[in-house]
Design a protein with these regions (language model features):
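Bacterial N-terminal signal peptides that target proteins for export
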Residues: 1-9
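Bacterial signal peptide processing site
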Residues: 21-23
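Surface-exposed cap/linker segments adjacent to membranes
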Residues: 27-55
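Concave beta-strand-loop units of leucine-rich repeat
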Residues: 32-34, 58, 63-101, 105-166
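Generic recognition of cysteine residues
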Residues: 7-8, 52, 73, 147
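C-terminal motif of bacterial Sec signal peptides marking the signal peptidase cleavage site
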Residues: 16-19
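A residue-level signal for beta-strand positions that form part of recognition/binding surfaces
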Residues: 14, 41, 70
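Residue-level signal for mature regions of secreted extracellular proteins and peptides
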Residues: 13, 45, 158-159
């Protein structure tokens, strides 16, 4: 009888609770579980980038800045990257087909391993030179890019440059 009670009531209760991870849970009017709030302590002026980061935080239930490890903001109309460096855990960043020009903010995210900046308006790749962990880099489709000097991206295993830099 006890086994039947456990199977019929306790098991489904735990199943329901696991689906309610975003809500306070009360027993006898006492809160027994409060979820950690999502990370919101950042300021990103670019609307496209801000919306993309907000969505990534919601999708990944990110509660601290370093927890955001991957971000895909392709085709988002992004022009500026200011404020992105608060996400110190970023390893993969995809910003394909935007209007990005300045990469200084990326130089502060030393955890980056893969950066896709194809089809933007980048001119100066120098801020990427100091990213020691960078392994994959795509700068194709940036017609005004100042071609990286030989040896400046030796740490990068895979580099895709615009046609005029090949």
């Amino acid at each position: 009888m006890l086994r039947h009670l456990v199977c019929c009531f306790v098991g489904p209760a735990f199943l329901i609770l696991s689906a309610c991870q975003e809500y306070d849970f009360k027993v006898n009017d006492k809160i027994v579980y409060t979820p950690t709030p999502l990370f919101r302590d950042y300021a990103i002026p670019d609307t496209g980038l801000n919306d993309c980061v907000k969505q990534a935080i919601n999708d990944g239930t990110v509660t601290t800045a370093p927890q955001l490890m991957s971000l895909d903001c392709s085709f988002a109309g992004i022009e500026g990257l200011e404020g992105l460096s608060i996400f110190t855990g970023l390893k993969a960043l995809r910003l394909s087909a935007n209007q990005v020009r300045n990469l200084v903010e990326l130089s502060k995210i030393t955890t980056l391993e893969a950066v896709y900046l194809d089809d933007n308006k980048i001119i100066d790749p120098v801020p990427l030179y100091g990213l020691a962990g960078l392994r994959d880099l795509d700068l194709s489709g940036n017609p005004n890019l100042q071609c990286p000097k030989p040896g400046s991206l030796t740490q990068v295993a895979s580099t895709v440059l615009p046609q005029h830099c090949r």
